[in-house]
Amino acid sequence: MKRLFGLIGFTFLFVLSAVFYSDFNEIVFAIIGSLGLLSVAVGIFLIISKKNKSFGKSLCVFAFAVIYSASNMIGYSEYVNNTVINNYSDKEITASGYICDEIITTDSSCSFIIKTDKINGQPSDAKIQIISYSNVDAEPFEKVNFTAHTYKNNVNSQLSHGIFLKAYFYDGFKIDATGEKVTTFYSFAVSIRRAMKNSLDMLLPEDYSTLCRAVLLGEKTALDSSVKDDFSLTGTSFLIVVSGMHLVIITSFVLFLVRKLTKNRFLITGFTTFTVIAFMAVTGFAHSVVRAGVMMIIVSLASSNLRIADSLNNLGFAAVVLTAFNPYAVADIGMLLSFSATTGIILWSRPIERSVLRFFHYKNKRKDGFVGTVVYYIKRLFKICVNMLSVSVSAFLWILPITAVAFNRISPIVILVSLLCEPFVSALLVCSLLCSVLYICPFISFFAYPFGLVSGLCSKAILWLVSTFSQLPFSTIKTHSLYWFVWIGVSILLAIGGLFVINRKFYVRISVLISISVLVIGASLNVLLTADNGEMKIYNVGNGVFATVNCPDSCSVISCGGNRASADDVTADISESYSDIEYMIIPNQNNKYSSLERFAVAEFDLNNILVYDNDIKKQNLLNAFDGNSRQTFGGNSHFTLNLSDTVTDEVICVDNTMFQFIKGKNVTVLFVPTDADLSNLPEKYRNPDCLLIDTVPENFDLISCNTVIFSGSEKQFKKNYYSIKEISPTVISTSERNITVNLNGG
């Protein structure tokens, strides 16, 4: 079988992704099981009947891969992930271990990972993310003893690395550093990474050094939020996330130097392998880098033995390496994008390049004379540009479905921006590597300065390009609407249909026309149908209220409380559609309404923060909290916020209580916080369509409404259920799910 590992690897990726992202749905398991059994039956029949033994063997291998990967995901989830979650989640633990990676710091917080060896006195190998809003008196790879209240970790990128728990420094956390350090190969790599970062910080201004650190080492936490937004809006975030592209550039540069020194293919293979492993370690063994590293090592080994490695087979083998023993690796969306982009480049870049060159009747024979030489090199440059374009287009088309589904947005200008930025990124990678390494070498550190200068100039060019293009209208398009998925589905079906058509030239033209028509018609209908959209979303956050008002062009938070364990889910849900928040309103500083504020501040750009509190001292302390300016007020206040053209939020502050009356075209919602007395609320606000509460307010009999929305835990809901039923016969709770209210549609 020519591409055994290709078949197994891609099957692993497909099955594991289907199981994980369907949240272990029973229907998905039924489909996968049926597919495996059917493949086995057909494969055995073909082998026995000798009609097509080769295809029969492929079907049997496919069936094995389907069954193994599904079973592997079930076993890993049940005996690895769930064991840790069931034993330690939402409990206070006492544990020992060591900080197993670098401590990541930002302006307002720091986080680090502890790998435990004992929990509650019992041997236990678990990884726990610790989040702190103050400095931690410990060093990377230092042994520690600690006490913490742990929560389930729901961040997919961390689940992919086996980090199933998290804890917060201020939530009963105590840590005692022993001073003893653990020495491993990875700890040595982290030391080199820290030294390289210090070199870049010493050589370059902050804006440029942080970009170099992001591009070279994948550390984008230090980047300014506006810079990250610019990269996100232009769809070029992959440039500041260490990936296979970065590894290829670095390794190609090293090989260029090595080949100048030796022609021995075994030495070249050794240098290649060393460079790949070193770069993987320094960048934290990111899945996309490991994918590229495995492929590169295979190609190098094949070359040393005078063989040509099959690209798809190599890619499949890399998938097997990454997922065979860690099926949760598919939780890293970056890894899936890496595999998808690479597959697109392998399958489509050459055909696209040939088609473009054929369209321009490209022929490039060198002719004598100056003019002939100039024309030759111009045509050669044109071919290089076509090659770069074909690679970018093929990668973009293959990651488009994943990007649209995972991030709910795409950038139409990503190909143009990436083509303009990639030459600068390549130069930046090489020069920042050289200057960061040379600067820490005694006696020759002065050689780092010219490379630092080039790195700074490249950083300036990249930042200018990305910032300029991010300001263009339609630099990014939201794809959370149904028409996008219809368009993707139609396009995929048209592409599959092309495999069975003889006259492909005519079919391609018709397919492109149909695809564009579906997209344009869908977008037009979406604009007409959603122009007046406005909804209120109340999240399942346990004890407290976190509610947003979402409009087509803006998002506002009317309360941001709840259990800290739900912070990641809430911020991730909002960030799928919005990068900034127009208004954040804190009804009072009780944790039930404010505990998740710091998470929102860290994740989003906040245009207006309004805090109601009569305590003058607390008001004065707020602005020093994280540098964000807040409008604080107390007393009896009354004002209206225009959240959109069709939705308003009327704020009524009476007797130390903030009421909020949210009004859409057809629906009104009254938000009443704890300890409120409804007799203080003006009578005209006592007849909302929906009442949002987290406890039963005083004088609730004064309210007349159609529906009561209770935000709180299941225990609280059951405790207050009969009292709530007296307000309205229709009662819904966030204890099991998020609740959405259509403010303009009823």
Where are these regions (language model features)?
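Hydrophobic alpha-helical transmembrane segments in multi-pass membrane proteins
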Residues: 3, 226-414, 481-530
